[in-house]
Amino acid sequence: PERFEAGTPNIIGVCSLLSSIKVIKSIGFDKIELLEENLKKTLLDGLKGMPDIITYGDSNYKNRIGVVVFNVKDIHHDVISERLANFRGISIRNGTFCAHPYVRRLLNLKDEEFSKYAYSNKPRPGMLRVSLGLYNTKEEIEEFLNTLELVKEKDFRL
């Protein structure tokens, strides 16, 4: 099977999978689902309450998973991501998330519009992504939203 294996097998990942499953089962899927639903609602309601935020995806939080993508009007995603990280140590993903065709579609960009950035020095189009997990709390979501309010101001300085 060597020719079908790309790189070193993820032995640690395989070993830790069983432990992860045990933890999830001990907590209970119903509790995890309820937690994620509450966190999604808090996050989406907070983002929707900011007029300069553009969210992407289904507007009904019950039809979503714990991943929320958005942009801040008139501020590049790199800038917001960097400000969050440098100001409060909040790390979120930004860019196209290895899903270029989908992001391009959500941003309503044609292939030729998007490809002109490939060999240019212009900032590339993309989005900001918050991923919620079992370990997140409502307080962390509120801290994120409060910090986002600060760092999205055009005159924000560290």
Language model features by range: what are they?
Residues 1-158:
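Pyridoxal 5′-phosphate
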